[in-house]
């Protein structure tokens, strides 16, 4: 037997058998076959040929009047498909002299959504070959129908196509055709349109994604549980005989991560969030806030960076340098000793009053004036000690040796002005 020559364009025997099968019978397809045509392929290779009465190579698309069935009954009417099903279906008019199609079905109706989508050819001309419309099935009667998850994509040919199929499926309402009986009018609008039916499953997909998120959260909590147990064990070891620390460790809660209060350095350190392995651990692990604080103090210690930050400084803080302006530099050859004050003049009445009050208090040697009047003028912030003693040294009072050393350590310079010096030049 002579084998067919593939170069001559003849089809293999399997394809020939498919071409010779009767319309409406189930197609004989090899395992693993999937029917996923594009919009252009559906219109050009299937709908146009069907409208022009050209035989199709495989009857994979069944001929069914979709509007005589409910969408959940259509999968068993299809020749092929698992998640989506394809049908050739006629369309009828809703009114005898109108162009609107009748969308009513057995227990509901199909409602169009959005606008028509043009289908363009993939060639260089980019010609419009068809139109795609999306519809949703509603149970009941309009306008109180209940929306379902059944979707239909309806493909029809364009009006301007030059093919014979376009003439047969034009959207322009043809003149009514009188039937055999008197007064009978045909309601046929289109001989054939191609429809794809499927059930939307977005809600199920969203539920599946939600379950996946929950699983990931549970995995993260399970991964963190061993580290939480280790922190609780360490807290129990550091607490020793402390009852609160023992309770916190026994119930598996990392109470040290709630709050830490250092009584020596007077600081609060927040290390993390309060964690517990179960919901009952929070109520049974500690009966009061004081027990939580005791467990935190026993379990946690301040870090090295905190100790370094809060360590006392060997240099005393000078309040006058923080709040008063810096003293101006004196020209060379001038001295700030008490014998040169005669060549200087205070610029304001307040400074003059301050000088007079201090001089009187120091010259008279009155302990009450010397101790109370000077802080009222020189030390308005209430800073005592070495800073005040330094001012006494500046104003000319005699000081003990330890007071003089403390005053020299402050390095404070009181601002004076020269009467014959222009500071702005």
From Swiss-Prot:
Cellular-component GO terms for this entry: nucleus
InterPro entries the record matches: NAC-dom (IPR003441), NAC_dom_sf (IPR036093)
Ranges annotated as DNA-binding: 129-206
Start and end residues of each NAC domain: 29-200
Compartments, record wording: Nucleus
Biological process annotations from GO: anther development; pollen development; regulation of DNA-templated transcription; system development
Coiled-coil residues: none
Organ and tissue specificity: Highest expression in stamens. Expressed in leaves.
A GO molecular function held by the record: DNA binding
Induction: Up-regulated by drought, salt and cold treatments.
Keywords: DNA-binding, Nucleus, Transcription, Transcription regulation
Annotated region (Disordered), positions in chain: 1-34
Biased composition regions of type Polar residues, renumbered to the chain: 1-10
Biased composition (Low complexity): 12-23
Function noted in UniProt: Transcription factor of the NAC family associated with male fertility. Involved in anther development, but not in senescence. Reduced expression of NAC5 via RNAi leads to male-sterility.
Domain notes: The NAC domain includes a DNA binding domain and a dimerization domain.
Name of the featured protein: NAC domain-containing protein 10
Provenance organism: Oryza sativa subsp. japonica
GN (gene name): NAC010
């Amino acid at each position: 037997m002579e084998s067919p020559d593939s170069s001559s364009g003849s089809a293999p025997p399997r394809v020939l058998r498919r071409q010779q099968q009767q319309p409406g019978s189930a197609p004989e397809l090899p395992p693993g076959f999937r029917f996923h045509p594009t919009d252009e392929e559906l219109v050009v290779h299937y709908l146009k040929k069907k409208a022009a009465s050209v035989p199709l190579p495989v009857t994979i698309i069944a001929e069914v009047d979709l509007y005589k069935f409910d969408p959940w009954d259509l999968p068993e009417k299809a020749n092929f498909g698992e998640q989506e099903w394809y049908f050739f279906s006629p369309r009828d008019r809703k009114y005898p002299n109108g162009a609107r199609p009748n969308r009513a079905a057995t227990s509901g109706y199909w409602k169009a959504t959005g606008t028509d989508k043009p289908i363009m050819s993939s060639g260089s001309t980019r010609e419009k070959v068809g139109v795609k419309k999306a519809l949703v099935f509603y149970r009941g009667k309009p306008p109180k129908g209940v929306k379902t998850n059944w979707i239909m994509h309806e493909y029809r040919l364009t009006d301007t196509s030059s093919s014979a199929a376009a003439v047969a499926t034009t959207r322009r309402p043809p003149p009514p055709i009188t039937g055999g009986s008197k007064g009978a009018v045909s309601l046929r609008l289109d001989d054939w349109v191609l429809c794809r039916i499927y059930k939307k499953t977005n809600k199920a997909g969203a539920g599946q994604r939600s379950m996946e998120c929950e699983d990931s959260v549970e995995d993260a909590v399970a991964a963190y549980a061993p580290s939480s147990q280790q922190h609780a064990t360490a807290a129990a070891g550091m607490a020793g005989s402390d009852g609160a620390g023992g309770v916190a460790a026994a119930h598996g809660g990392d109470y040290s991560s709630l709050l830490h209060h250092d009584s020596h350095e007077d600081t609060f350190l927040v290390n993390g969030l309060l964690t517990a392995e179960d919901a009952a651990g929070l109520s049974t692990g500690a009966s009061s806030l004081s027990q939580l604080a005791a467990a935190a103090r026993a379990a946690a210690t301040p870090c090295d960076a905190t100790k370094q930050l809060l360590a006392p400084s060997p240099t005393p803080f000078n309040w006058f340098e923080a709040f008063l302006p810096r003293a101006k530099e004196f020209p060379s050859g001038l001295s700030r000793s008490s014998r040169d004050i005669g060549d200087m003049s205070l610029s304001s009445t307040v400074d003059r009053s301050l000088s007079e009050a201090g001089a009187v208090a120091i010259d008279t040697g009155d302990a009450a004036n010397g101790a109370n009047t000077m802080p009222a003028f020189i030390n308005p912030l209430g800073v005592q000690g070495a800073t005040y003693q330094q001012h006494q040294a500046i104003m000319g009072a005699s000081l003990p040796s330890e007071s003089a050393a403390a005053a020299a350590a402050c390095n404070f310079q009181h601002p004076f002005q020269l009467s014959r010096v222009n500071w702005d030049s």
